[in-house]
């Protein structure tokens, strides 16, 4: 496969970047496959275009029209999903992984399309009943909801290049607001493929969507009070963006989805070998290995009664040992690589941090087999289970997320202890 150049979509046309930019790689074999750059794009002009062209066109549509528009788009993309699967494989995703991303994303469009039934056939929504604020009803209050007159900027993560885009644009399009989509560059080639089909469909009004495949550094310099910014990614990056002076000055809403230290708790009354115990083990492993653990819903903390700690350890080890790692196109492979070498190095760094206070009891950083691929060329990473026998003292596992097939097993003695451990994840 020759190296292809990703395009950006700005102000109603496809634009080639002024420079070659960043090289993107096949996650399975490490081959260079695309380059991405935003060099030459005028972010301020793109945002004005969205406000002046996309916003009026969407705002004049009723909720019914917007909902039917989303339904038509969902059906259009669903008819073309086979090609999306082909490109998704380059990210290291298995077919099951791609199903979550591609069809899950399209499902979001269908879901928001169906919400039109809860709204009137109008471009605005009157909320609740009028509130009487004076004795003679000469002063009343009533809320009316209308679309913002700005643009939504969606800064997305690398793990769900399709879902991440579609779940967000479904919201802003239904609300009558245009968007600029900024996918994570590492897997932006899959987002670009789907985005091209969206534009080719001619279903959306002009100016509804724009795409930046390369860097979007500086785009927040142009936000205004009617705009909104959404971010999915690391907490560190999110905090920096949230503190941008322009966001603060213009009071721009900033929605952040970042690190998640999700917990799964085995009840005190569950017996090893029971159906509930088996479901627990299966679910932990499934969440560890789906998308190679690159999910915000992945289980990072496994909290179990102290008296069954060893049984859980053994059961997790056995099930993970049967998980074949490799090229997802090869028969029998159940877990592919991480999205790229950069992601692999980041996970290794986080594992090293976690290992300072806890012990690896299942898996290895280096000693594992890969089927149908070279584990050194691809971004492969074996499932890792840590044991933290003192989770109230060694608290790194409640703060550090290794965004891969990594989890920490820890004991508890009472329900109150289990609740306290869950809370230490700070809402995850």
Which residue ranges define each predicted feature?
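Rossmann-like NAD(P) dinucleotide-binding subdomain of oxidoreductase/dehydrogenase enzymes
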Residues: 120-279, 412
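Hydrophobic packing residues within well-ordered alpha-helices of enzyme cores
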Residues: 88, 109, 191-194, 222-223, ...
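Residue-level signal for inorganic ion chemistry
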Residues: 30, 66, 176, 209, ...
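Conserved C-terminal structural/oligomerization subdomain of aldehyde/semialdehyde dehydrogenase
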Residues: 28-34, 68, 203-206, 225, ...
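ALDH superfamily catalytic-core signature
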Residues: 197, 201-202, 228, 237-392, ...
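Short, well-ordered beta-strand elements within core beta-sheets of diverse protein domains
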Residues: 32-38, 55-59, 133, 153-154, ...
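N-terminal Rossmann-like NAD(P)+-binding subdomain of aldehyde/semialdehyde dehydrogenases
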Residues: 1-137, 322, 339, 347-348
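Residue-level detector of anion-binding/catalytic polar loops
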Residues: 178, 360, 428
């Amino acid at each position: 496969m020759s190296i292809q150049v990703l395009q950006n979509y700005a102000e109603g046309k496809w634009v080639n970047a002024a420079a070659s930019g960043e090289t993107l790689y096949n996650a399975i074999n490490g081959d260079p496959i695309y380059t991405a750059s935003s060099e030459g794009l005028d972010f301020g002009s793109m945002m004005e275009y969205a406000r002046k062209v996309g916003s009026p066109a969407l705002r004049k549509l009723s909720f019914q029209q917007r909902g039917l528009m989303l339904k038509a788009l969902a059906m259009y993309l669903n008819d073309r999903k086979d090609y999306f699967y082909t490109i998704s494989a380059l990210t290291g995703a298995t077919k099951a992984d791609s199903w979550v991303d591609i069809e899950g994303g399209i499902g979001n469009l269908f879901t928001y399309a169906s919400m039109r039934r809860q709204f009137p056939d109008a471009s605005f929504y009157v909320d609740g009943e009028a509130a009487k604020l004076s004795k003679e009803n000469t002063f009343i209050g009533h809320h009316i909801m209308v679309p913002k007159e700005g643009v939504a900027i969606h800064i997305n993560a690398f793990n769900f290049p399709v879902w991440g885009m579609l779940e967000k644009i479904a919201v802003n399009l239904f609300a009558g607001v245009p968007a600029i989509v900024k996918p994570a560059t590492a897997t932006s080639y899959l987002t670009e493929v789907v985005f091209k089909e969206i534009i080719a469909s001619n279903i959306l009004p002009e100016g509804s969507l724009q795409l930046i495949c390369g860097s979007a550094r500086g785009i927040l310099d142009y936000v205004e009070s009617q705009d909104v910014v959404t971010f999915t990614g690391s907490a560190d990056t999110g905090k920096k963006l949230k503190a941008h002076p322009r966001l603060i000055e213009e009071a721009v809403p900033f929605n952040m989805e970042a690190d998640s230290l999700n917990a799964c708790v085995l009840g005190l009354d569950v017996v090893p070998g029971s159906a509930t115990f088996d479901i627990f083990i299966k679910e932990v492993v499934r969440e560890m290995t789906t998308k190679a653990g690159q999910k915000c819903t992945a289980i990072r903390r496994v909290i179990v009664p102290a008296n069954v700690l060893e049984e859980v350890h053994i059961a997790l080890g056995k099930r993970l040992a049967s998980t074949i790692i490799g090229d997802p196109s090869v028969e029998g492979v159940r877990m592919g690589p991480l999205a790229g070498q950069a992601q692999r190095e980041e996970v290794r760094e986080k594992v090293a941090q976690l290992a300072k206070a806890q012990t690896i009891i299942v898996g290895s950083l280096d000693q594992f087999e890969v089927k149908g691929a070279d584990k050194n060329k691809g971004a492969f990473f074996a499932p890792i289970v840590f044991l933290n026998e003192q989770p109230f003292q060694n608290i790194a596992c409640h703060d550090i997320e290794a965004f891969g097939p990594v989890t920490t097993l820890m004991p508890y003695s009472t329900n109150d202890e289990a609740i306290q451990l869950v809370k230490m994840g700070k809402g995850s």
